[in-house]
Amino acid sequence: MGDVPISLSQMLRDSLGLAAAVETGTFMGRGAQALRSVFPRVWSIELSDELYYAACREISAPGLTFVYGSSVQVLPALLTEIAEPALFWLDGHYSGEGTAGVEMECPLLEEIAAIDASPNAPRSVLLIDDARLFLGPPPDPHKPDHWPTLMSVLDTLRTKHDRYLTLFEDMVIAVPPAARTIIESYYRTQSSQ
């Protein structure tokens, strides 16, 4: 589980006029807090009741909403509340002991399908964490048949909308074609550090 790339999120917000963010996989709430420092409205979806209640107890900020449930079930209704393009930080997968989702370890393709059904999908940004887990069978204790391949992730991202797709470090990036120069600028900046 990597951290939300804040500088990239800011660049995309400014370039594309994004005013909201959605995170799948709250875990300890760091990602939600980081996104809230960039966006006025943030929703973070968590399947583990223990992690959800801990985040609700320990983290509070105006415009930040924690949502309990399966991202696959929650996203369609949530997307009706978001009237503009958004940044999606997709990190809602089973990560071993202390996390939820062992029955469906990686609902990523279903999350993408839910986002793609939204009228704002063509202008939204999808940042998918843990790209390394799609390059081959994930390590134990994961069930390989629960995880899509990198090609199936990329194919799903291309199915309904024209997007610029790339990988950077441990992240799949899917943005509207107009944001390609933003991604290239981010690459150059990060690569020189």
Model segments located where?
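A short alpha-helical cap/connector motif
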Residues: 1-87, 93-193
